[in-house]
Amino acid sequence: MDCAEEKAKSLRRQIADTEAELAQLKLQLLSLEEKDTNSKNLEAKTSASEKDDPVTHIENKWPMSLEEYKRYGRQMIVPDIGIKGQLRLKSASILLVGAGGLGCPAAAYIAGAGVGTIGIVDGDIVEESNLHRQILHSTDRVGVNKAGIVKDYDIVLDCTDHPTSRYLISDICVLLQKPLVSASALRTDGQLIVLNNPALPPGDLSGGSCYRCVFPKPPPPEAVTSCGDGGIIGPVVGVMGVLQALEAIKLIASGKLAAVGENDNTSPTPKMNPTTMLLFSTNGSTPFRNVRLKGRRSNCFACGEEAQLALEQMSSGSMDYVLFCGMTHPVKLLSDEERIEARDYDSIRKEKEHLLIDVREKVQFDICNIEGSYNIPFSSFQGSKGSSDHPLSTLTENLNPKTPIYVVCRLGNDSQIVTKKMKDLGLDQKGDRYIGDIKGGLRSWKEQVDGSWPEY
């Protein structure tokens, strides 16, 4: 970002503050004019056009239109906002990365608060299964690209749902010195954190923590669960999105944002609250909890004293976030001979004795399942060494040694892991018994066999 752009952003902020002061002076002047005993004589001299259109004459005295006063009036009378805060909101710009369950409510409330410029970055398309939480979209927009790409904003909201994007967005905010409001939600829980606030240059440990400070190492790939896999309750992600909007509004209205490189020596730097992470749990006895976090880590890769991150790395694409998070390839543990197409399994199941194991969690199995299948959740295989009391041992104890076993899951990933696990336990009888998974899982079952299969 060049110096001219930074100077322009600094000037816009100065204009907003000056307009707020001007509004106060105009209020004082108006009060004096109303008390002036000669006010009637002044009104008599008012031009006919001004008498015909008094609204236009009055509006010229105020920094906002009368419509804006009416729209944001109840917000402006809150002491934490006021006229100055509202003018700051009007001149501010916010970038939302992700227009899904978090981004939709956040965008709605940010726009409703009167933020002047809102950018939305999202390369995904609208899916019908997302409409219960992505409230800006409707069924007639299914398949439409959600948003374009916008840059150069005052605050960034991370409304994505994957570690790779969270690390990427945080790194960019550190390098460009932008505060970041990050949130996540899964099942019945959510978390919220304001990062890089204050947004000081890398190496300045008085700045706010970044995402790498809080999570130096990404979670293992097998531990990452998306809303599509783990499920989400709409109001939960809605709560977190609204809280993101609230944090952004608080930051802007407080006047604590500063342009990159701006150094005002005439006023002390405002004291920032310690970084905390807000934890929300629908089923908890205390739904909201705050966890206090340490500041910037001195050895942080992105913002520490010897930060190794540079804009050139981001521009050139040399920073591989997929590799960093350990997600270099899709799951491919089995050979083609160990996998079977859904249509081929459909033919086999009608003619041959076999065992079909569905490794989805019970809550998903109860939604819909293939007739004759047995449910042994994927979670029961994690850490299991094939003990005698494991459901799999009970199920296969009296099974013919040559009876084939097929494994199915939702998308064809967990089923590969379980198939390999079963072979490692020796259930393939040293190759005498076929054990394989249904390629593509139940999604392929819907595409190739049963078009009426519920897709969730």
UniProtKB/Swiss-Prot annotation:
E.C. number, please?
Answer: 2.7.7.80, 2.8.1.11
Q: Start and end of every Rhodanese domain?
A: 350-454
The UniProt record gives the binding positions of ATP as: G101, D122, S129, N130, L131, H132, R133, K146, D161, H162
Location relative to the cell: Cytoplasm, Cytosol
> Which catalytic residues are annotated?
C227, C409
Principal place of residence? cytoplasm
Which GO terms fall under molecular function for this chain's record?
ATP binding; metal ion binding; molybdopterin-synthase adenylyltransferase activity; molybdopterin-synthase sulfurtransferase activity; nucleotidyltransferase activity; thiosulfate-cyanide sulfurtransferase activity; URM1 activating enzyme activity
InterPro entries recorded for this chain? MOCS3/Uba4, Rhodanese-like_dom, Rhodanese-like_dom_sf, ThiF/MoeB/HesA, ThiF_NAD_FAD-bd, Ubiquitin-activating_enz
Q: Hey, which pathway is this one from? A: tRNA modification; 5-methoxycarbonylmethyl-2-thiouridine-tRNA biosynthesis
Instruction: Tell me the cofactor note.
Output: Binds 1 zinc ion per subunit.
One GO term (biological process): protein urmylation
* GO cellular component entries: cytoplasm; cytosol
Q: Where does Zn(2+) bind?
A: C210, C213, C300, C303
Function, in words: Plays a central role in 2-thiolation of mcm(5)S(2)U at tRNA wobble positions of cytosolic tRNA(Lys), tRNA(Glu) and tRNA(Gln). Also essential during biosynthesis of the molybdenum cofactor. Acts by mediating the C-terminal thiocarboxylation of sulfur carriers urm1 and mocs2a. Its N-terminus first activates urm1 and mocs2a as acyl-adenylates (-COAMP), then the persulfide sulfur on the catalytic cysteine is transferred to urm1 and mocs2a to form thiocarboxylation (-COSH) of their C-terminus.
- Report the HAMAP family cross-referenced here: MOCS3_Uba4
Q: Which family does it belong to?
A: In the N-terminal section; belongs to the HesA/MoeB/ThiF family. UBA4 subfamily.
**PANTHER family registered for this protein in UniProt:** ADENYLYLTRANSFERASE AND SULFURTRANSFERASE MOCS3 (PTHR10953:SF102), UBIQUITIN-ACTIVATING ENZYME E1 (PTHR10953)
Write down what this protein is called.
Answer: Adenylyltransferase and sulfurtransferase uba4
Species this protein is from:
Sclerotinia sclerotiorum (strain ATCC 18683 / 1980 / Ss-1)
